[in-house]
């Protein structure tokens, strides 16, 4: 296994990953996240460390698997089984309604965001 190096978030990744592809994936993930919170009732977690960790995980999954799979869930390689875990995952609304945040913590309710500030 190749050595691991840190992304800006402190997450670790395979340094053999094409850095240009990773940078493009990060831009694409950031556009998706901004667009989603603009058109949904949810907000990004006010904790920038959480957002960076999840964003970096989404970007790595995009490079490695071609989809923005939620980094808090296992990617099996079976498209039908993995599809519900593409961000925003199919369970995020239920999780936010129940706890104020989705499982990975990137999306939160407006009330959660207000209380966390």
Q: How does the language model describe each region?
A:
Residues 4-7:
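Leucine-biased recognition of intrinsically disordered, low-complexity hydrophobic segments
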Residues 11-13:
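Short, positively charged and aromatic/hydrophobic N-terminal segments
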Residues 18-117:
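Long, distal/terminal scaffolding or interaction modules
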